[in-house]
Amino acid sequence: PQCASALDEPAKRAISIKRTLDTVNEISHAFLLPALLRGRVGEFSISALESELEGIQEKIDAIAFELYEISEDDQNAIKLGNKEESSLDSSIEADEEADADDLEEESGDNTSDQGNLLSWCVGVGFGRFDLRLATLERSAPPEPDPFDPLPAKSPGMLPDGAAPFHVHEGILVDDQGHPHDLARLVEEVLARVDVAVPEDVRRWLQRDFFPFHLQRYSKSRRKA
């Protein structure tokens, strides 16, 4: 019982870290803001979080070995198996990254922090994401408990009933000077969050955005 209770806090912290890492992933139920803006709603360092998570995993393993009275030989065998599995996962991940690199060659640096920021700006323009988190006009909601039901919307999305950044009929256009010109809206969003506006926003939208969006929102990034 003492060992079992000792697992409570590290397990909860591990879940919290994994969720925090997902707060910059716009297709996650935990999404808040893109990486370039995430620090505005709380301290955020991917390397520090991943390092802490690795330490927690080692602590949980040690407690589990003691709890189930795993011999030292079996512990070594388990650790070896975990390393082999990790190596296989890394190989699969490398293949997926190679596929993503192919897409990047076709559509620019789509997985960069800037690409993610511009994608978020597009979402703000369409009324999907909430600009107010980045301007601190709205506070981030508290972290849910591990077994709470998944929300219908991520906390970074515009709440029901809230006014969107730009009122439109569901269609935005690529037409300089048009009141619903998407490139202009993206530039306005960047200005509102005090981020320098790139010179090539319209070009990025014309050439890079759709391949990026398809890659991000497809179930698999692999190409036949």
Model-derived features with residue positions:
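Extended amphipathic alpha-helical segments enriched in small hydrophobics
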Residues: 1-64
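Active-site-proximal loop/hinge segments that shape catalytic or ion-binding/gating pockets
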Residues: 68
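Terminal accessory regions of large proteins
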Residues: 62-65, 73-224
